[in-house]
Amino acid sequence: MTKALNGVRILDFTHVQSGPTCTQLLAWFGADVIKVERPGVGDITRGQLQDIPNVDSLYFTMLNHNKRSITLDTKNPKGKEVLTALIKSCDVLVENFGPGVLDRMGFSWEKIQSLNPKMIVASIKGFGPGPYEDCKVYENVAQCTGGAASTTGFRDGLPLVTGAQIGDSGTGLHLALGIVTALYQRTVTGRGQKVTAAMQDGVLNLSRVKLRDQQRLAHGPLKEYSQFGEGIPFGDAVPRAGNDSGGGQPGRILKCKGWETDPNAYIYFITQAPVWEKICDVIGEPDWKTHPDYAKPAARLKHLNDIFARIEQWTMTKTKFEAMDILNKDDIPCGPILSMKELAEDQSLRATGTVVEVDHPTRGKYLSVGNPIKMSDSPTEVMRSPLLGEHTDEILRQVLGFSDQQVAEVHDSGALEPPRKAAAAE
């Protein structure tokens, strides 16, 4: 079956997580992603957080499925020739270098456009234009500068970063959408364009409900936040609210049976207004249906701590899965806190391809996330990540049409690897 992005060729200069997230998603949709790596070194994540000596790390393998790898020294004159030919042969160049790196390589936007007017140049940066645009940014820096950390955690505690990679992977997903949109626009204009996604912008986009709340503060307290019910005044910035729901329906994480020994024996419980009476029945408080302090959503806001304390008395008598089964029958929104171990062993996620087992030639079988987006006419087959330079000769021949002699000349130039040394005279 033809894949959605079949025929699209991506020149991938990305490394670590943000850019590879973007290009891996495009590869899953069928694009031919050519990952350009330094000879003998490659993407730095190949050697980071290694759990097995002398093999590509999971950090690398889980971000570079379905790609081809070519090693290329872009400072080498022959390497520049190869890169020039690749630019002419590809549809999109994706990079997450520091500011100005492409220009210093001799491939400015203007130069690239002169070589291939249809090429889309997509970039991930830490910040957009402004006072911080030259600053180096990593995942947690993006979370802190994008508004996520200041609004995550408990009111009386430190700002916290989330375990989800909303800065790196989140921005990569944003960029992928920009690339696909630019490809579509190119069908109309016939031209390439620059596409940029800044990590600060991406995190702020994912934190938009907190920007919503910042504006609401000008008109009064945020009544769904627990501190309102506790009578604690609000300041001039959105506070950290623990596990309070970010929407209009109050919610909390509550203990379940076994919480004393299981760090994940918890459930998220939302007191949604349409099912309030069912909640009262489940927890054994039928009088709350008509009690003036509890019957109406507005009245309940001042008593949320008491309400959730009572609900927790009930959830502590059930495992998180027992509680979920009971609550789901009454359409009461809830969700168990699932550990990574539980997710890895969840057979339903295996069946949908959300979690996949991949076989790798040097590290063996491992688990990875699959494509989170399912398309009926473009199913995803997750293929292992490439070994360093595994497809170098294949790309030179198939993509650039090089002859055997031309391939040998590139090798001997040192552009792909150290030049072959003649045997020492005896």
UniProtKB/Swiss-Prot annotation:
Substrate binds at residues 247-249. Keywords: Transferase. GO terms for biological process: oxalate catabolic process. Pathway: Metabolic intermediate degradation; oxalate degradation; CO(2) and formate from oxalate: step 1/2. CoA binds at residues 17-18, 38, 72-75, 96-98, 104, 136-139. It comes from the Bacteria. Its EC number is 2.8.3.16. The keyword Transferase applies. It holds the Pfam family CoA_transf_3. It catalyses: formyl-CoA + oxalate = oxalyl-CoA + formate. The active site is at residue 168. GO terms for molecular function: formyl-CoA transferase activity. It is an enzyme of class 2 (transferase). Belongs to the CoA-transferase III family. Frc subfamily. Homodimer. Involved in the catabolism of oxalate and in the adapatation to low pH via the induction of the oxalate-dependent acid tolerance response (ATR). Catalyzes the transfer of the CoA moiety from formyl-CoA to oxalate. PANTHER family: SUCCINATE--HYDROXYMETHYLGLUTARATE COA-TRANSFERASE. This is Formyl-CoA:oxalate CoA-transferase. It comes from Rhodopseudomonas palustris (strain BisB18). The lineage of its organism: Bacteria, Pseudomonadati, Pseudomonadota, Alphaproteobacteria, Hyphomicrobiales. The gene is frc.
